[in-house]
């Protein structure tokens, strides 16, 4: 029950008539030489941590170590409660939880790297929002997380999820691709539609640079988690509507990796280019020299 690329994954789904989530769950059991109970228990713990990281800052904001972020999630939550939001219930909740998770991370709280700390808000942001709005069970969300895991595995095996190697497109891009695929399955989409959604995300985030102010995982990282979760939602919606992609996921992962390696070092997590060089941002950073 192993696979090296999306094409092989889709073949397994077709042959066994199983969703991506279950193929990935069974792979974890077999490759990890562990038990069904152990794998399920671990994913339940993952969801528990994700919830705490996403919900806590909404109630009790904490300033980040670098002083660049803190309180944004609570502002979004209050704006949603006021009835003046323009994004719609799912997206407003999703960006709130995505930004909240980055606040937790930046204040030394416990998060789940999804796939990295700098992109940790996108997957839980979208899935927790869908759970609240559509009343999905924790078990449903755990299954969706296995789906997200499959997409992350493909990116890590065949490309990268490191900003230092491939820019922010490899971090928030892959995170959003994972979220889009997971959301597509959660909402009843097919395995092929899941890969279309993931491919759509990578295409739309292609070339995004990694330029953290002060070298900290705060700004613009938090903002990009919000925009990443929005792109993931759009991609899932398109895929569920039956819109296909000309470029399959395997090719898009390769393209992302190729583009990332062509980015100059200044735009790959070194804090020597992009937003990291903005005087206004540097003046606000407690950690900047």
Predicted regions mapped to residue ranges:
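Generic N-terminal targeting/processing segments that precede catalytic cores or assembly contacts
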Residues: 1-109, 132-133, 242, 249-289
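Glycine- and small hydrophobic-enriched segments that form the cores of compact globular domains
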Residues: 86, 113-120, 132, 143, ...
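Acidic-glycine-rich active-site phosphate/pyrophosphate-binding loop
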Residues: 88-105, 140-159, 203-212, 271
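Glycine/serine-rich anion-binding loops at beta->alpha junctions
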Residues: 103-128, 169-176
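Alpha-helical support elements that line or immediately flank enzyme active sites
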Residues: 124-135, 180-188
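N-terminal glycine-/lysine-enriched basic segments
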Residues: 130, 156, 161-169, 175-176, ...
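Carbohydrate-binding/catalytic loop surfaces
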Residues: 165-176, 219-229
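Functionally critical mobile loop/hinge segments
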Residues: 181, 185-289
């Amino acid at each position: 029950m192993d696979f090296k690329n999306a094409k092989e994954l889709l073949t397994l789904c077709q042959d066994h008539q199983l969703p991506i989530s279950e193929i990935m769950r069974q792979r974890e059991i077999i490759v990890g030489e562990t038990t069904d109970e152990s794998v399920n228990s671990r994913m339940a713990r993952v969801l528990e941590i994700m919830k705490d990281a996403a919900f806590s800052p909404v109630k009790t904001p904490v300033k980040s170590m670098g002083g660049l972020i803190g309180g944004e999630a609570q502002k979004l939550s209050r704006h949603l409660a006021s009835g003046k939001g323009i994004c719609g219930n799912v997206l407003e909740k999703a960006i709130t939880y995505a930004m909240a998770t980055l606040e937790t991370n930046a204040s030394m709280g416990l998060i789940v790297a999804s796939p990295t700390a700098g992109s940790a808000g996108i997957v839980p942001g979208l899935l927790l929002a869908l759970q609240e709005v559509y009343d999905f069970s924790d078990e449903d969300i755990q299954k969706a997380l296995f789906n997200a895991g499959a997409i992350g595995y493909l990116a890590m095996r065949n490309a990268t999820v490191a900003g230092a190697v491939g820019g922010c497109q490899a971090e928030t891009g892959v995170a959003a691709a994972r979220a889009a695929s997971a959301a597509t399955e959660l909402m009843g989409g097919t395995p092929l539609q899941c890969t279309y959604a993931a491919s759509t995300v990578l295409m739309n985030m292609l070339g995004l640079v990694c330029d953290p102010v002060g070298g900290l995982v705060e700004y613009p990282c938090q903002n990009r988690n919000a925009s990443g979760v929005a792109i993931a939602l759009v991609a899932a919606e398109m895929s569920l509507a039956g819109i296909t992609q000309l470029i399959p996921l395997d090719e898009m992962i390769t393209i992302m990796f190729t583009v990332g390696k062509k980015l100059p070092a200044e735009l790959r997590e070194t804090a020597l280019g992009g937003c990291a060089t903005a005087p206004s941002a540097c003046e606000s950073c407690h950690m900047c020299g």
